[in-house]
Amino acid sequence: MMRQSRQAVLPEISGNKTSSLRKSICSDLLTLFNSPHSALPSLLVSGMPEWQVHNQSDKHLQSWYCRQLRSALLFHEPRIAALQVNLKEAYSHTLAISLEIMLYHDDEPLTFDLVWDNGGWRSATLENVS
């Protein structure tokens, strides 16, 4: 079965609307990560339960995880023009990722850090997004 790609025609954005867009993207991504019925693969949504049963130091697993996450986010978030996913920490009880995001009509990269904490994802950078 072929997957349909979604393309969005986005309006030009300037000034303080860019800041609002960046905050909106981060807020929407955090909601997506914490949604129990998210369309993201289960490892990406529930994070730690599945992560703990695997060898977290396995570089192939880490690479696979980043590729899966990148693919899912690009599919579900049409406002992202380019995305790089990096694992910052990958231990049995800690999973921290960093998303380097380029948005359409925004020349500055957006860095969004997420940490799996007490059964859910949280962001240390959401309040600092501008």
From Swiss-Prot:
It is found in: Cytoplasm. GO terms for cellular component: cytoplasm. The keyword Cytoplasm applies. One of its GO terms (molecular function) is anti-sigma factor antagonist activity. It comes from the Bacteria. Pfam families: GPW_gp25 (PF04965). GO terms for biological process: cellular response to oxidative stress; DNA damage response. Belongs to the GpW/Gp25 family. IraD subfamily. Interacts with RssB. HAMAP family: IraD. This is Anti-adapter protein IraD. It comes from Escherichia coli O45:K1 (strain S88 / ExPEC). The gene is iraD.
